[in-house]
Amino acid sequence: KSGVGRITIPDSLAPGYAALYGPRNFYSFYLVPGQQQEITRLTGQEIKFAGAAKAINIYLNSPFLNNRDPGYEKGEEEFLKAWALMPGRLQSHLDSLPLPADFKKSERKRLYYVACHSLLDYPLRHARLLRLKSYSPGERYYRKVSELLQEDPSAHEFWEYRQFFRNGIQLLGERKKTETGKPLDKLKCELDYICNHIKDEELAGYLVDESMSGYIRYFGSEGMEAFLPLYREKVKDEKQKAAFFRSYEQYTRLEKGRKAPHFSLLDKDGNRKNLSDWLG
């Protein structure tokens, strides 16, 4: 009733980044296990921090960091020139702040991938700002995305790093889908890229699971059989594997042509309806 919640973090964890999700937004948060920290939501979107890492948390939720726009309304060539300045600007802003040196060291690496996400946002944001029904960037844009997909195992702890690879590879796969109109071709393009370019086993397993689990959620299990051996090879986490194959088995029961499970109920007029009476 008071709206106050308490979360206890094990002292054995190292300080690091977290995200606090609300009904309409989320806040970045730097956790320091073993120390007291507070976050208070005021009116509207305004929030207040107290306790350990207060200055860091104010920085992470600052307008400068979260309202970055390299010029999404610009044409491709102009946008790429403007975007090239973003990593340096983010770094300079960080260097100008009186924040702990150990935090700055890790934050510099994370900021690079924050900027990379802004690059991936360009096609969708450009289309929305110019009210275009569809928009596909040119070869130069896709070449830039490919150039930036360089592995750095020391950055795997950062969500922004993992998501940049996931979203970047999906963007390249979406281009293939645009050519053929088939979602399965997009998935194959993503998996081919992972197999041919990703050397880090931990990152490869993460990306294969993201691509195949995402495909099943949106398009079902049809056509997935050929990729199952690859999943077993690349994904090492047994709990992750179990969750994936549980989902896969559930979706195979929804394939076209399969008999519907037994289920019946009374409608508002008292007539019994069976699920097997319906098609679709």
Model-predicted segments: where are they?
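Solenoid-like repeat scaffolds
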Residues: S96-L99, I194-K199, R232-D237
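Extended amphipathic alpha-helical segments with heptad-repeat/coiled-coil character used for oligomerization
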Residues: R108-G168
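Long, charge-rich alpha-helical interaction segments
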Residues: E151-Y218, G223-A226, A243
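A non-transmembrane, solvent-exposed segment enriched in polar/low-complexity residues
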Residues: K1-S106, R110, V114-Y122, H126-S134
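N-proximal helix/coil linker or "cap" segments that precede and/or mark the start of modular domains
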Residues: G205-V208, M212-L279
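Serine-centered coil/turn micro-motif
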Residues: A52-K54, E139, F158, E238
